[in-house]
């Protein structure tokens, strides 16, 4: 079974079938007809021949910082859903927040002739900037703002500013923050800036915001950081956390210390995932 056979059965040109297989422009009518023929025949294109012909395969590389993360899982599911519409496969690499793995996957995926790479950004380094410059395929970064490549990101600063404003409106004034590392701009810097912005607007000194940085976005780290903040600031009445899972760990530490969450202390995290529904 060849492209020519599919074209003959669908009543279209071989070029139309090729465009369909490669995610190219095509009328919806032709797309439906070709899809039905391929579905009926069980046709699968020869990937090796396709690579020789185009210099790439219908695969997009996705580099993730931690596949166990709820947010990463949601993003990955969305990517797969969109790739399926265009008949692309996903080649997934998990870095576990290891910069060497990140750089390694960028190289390996290019050698595997992927059509492009989606990098869920974590840390911005000179080595990564150079890798972007040298990359031979399109790269898009999610979750961070890197100058060398197109980026898709949330308004981390604005979101945490609004979250903190609501906490301040509830009367909380002794607010502390459990942060990420400075290397991670989105969660380490922009989210903390959002807390400081809200404090400044409320007439408080945002620059003096007490915070502790967690080394991983886990319950264990949230609990450890919360214990540390309770020792340093026992009269705190509000806690903003870098993620919901960190907030869940912080809640465990607050309860162990006899604090009543929602009554004598407010607690909030960023992420809107399952952890945020637990009290």
Question: Could you say what each language-model-derived stretch is?
Answer:
Residues 1-58:
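N-terminal helix-turn-helix DNA-binding module of bacterial transcription factors
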Residues 14-19, 53-68, 174-181:
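Short beta-strand segments enriched in small/hydrophobic residues
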Residues 32, 43-115, 193-196:
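Amphipathic helical "hinge" segments at domain boundaries
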Residues 40, 81-86, 110, 134-141, ...:
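Bacterial carbohydrate/catabolite-sensing allosteric modules
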Residues 40-46, 100, 120-122, 223, ...:
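Short gly/ser/thr-rich secondary-structure transition/capping motifs
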Residues 96-99, 120-125, 146, 245:
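Short beta->alpha connector loops
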Residues 124-135:
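Active-site-adjacent beta->alpha loops and helix N-cap segments on the catalytic face
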């Amino acid at each position: 079974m060849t492209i020519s056979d599919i074209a003959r059965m669908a009543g279209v040109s071989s070029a139309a079938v090729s465009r369909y297989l490669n995610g190219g422009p095509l009328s919806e009518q032709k797309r439906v007809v070709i899809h039905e023929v391929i579905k009926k025949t069980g046709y699968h294109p020869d990937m090796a021949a396709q690579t020789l012909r185009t210099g790439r395969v219908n695969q997009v590389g996705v580099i993730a910082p931690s596949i166990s993360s709820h947010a990463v899982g949601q993003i990955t599911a969305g990517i797969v859903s969109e790739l399926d519409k265009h008949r692309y496969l996903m080649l997934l690499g998990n870095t576990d927040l290891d910069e060497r793995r990140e750089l390694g996957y960028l190289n390996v995926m290019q050698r595997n002739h992927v059509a492009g790479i989606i990098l869920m950004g974590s840390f911005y380094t000179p080595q990564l900037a150079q890798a972007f410059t040298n990359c031979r395929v399109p790269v898009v970064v999610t979750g961070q703002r890197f100058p060398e490549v197109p980026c898709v990101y949330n308004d981390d600063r604005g979101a945490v500013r609004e979250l903190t404003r609501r906490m301040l409106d509830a009367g909380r004034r002794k607010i502390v923050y459990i942060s990420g590392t400075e290397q991670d701009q989105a969660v380490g810097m922009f989210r903390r800036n959002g807390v400081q912005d809200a404090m400044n607007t409320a007439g408080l000194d945002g620059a003096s915001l007490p915070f502790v940085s967690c080394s991983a976005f886990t319950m264990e780290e949230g609990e450890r950081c919360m214990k540390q903040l309770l020792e340093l600031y026992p009269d705190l009445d509000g806690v903003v956390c870098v993620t919901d899972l960190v907030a869940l760990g912080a809640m465990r530490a607050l309860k162990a210390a006899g604090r009543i969450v929602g009554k004598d202390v407010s607690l909030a995290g960023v992420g809107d995932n399952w952890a945020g529904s637990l009290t």
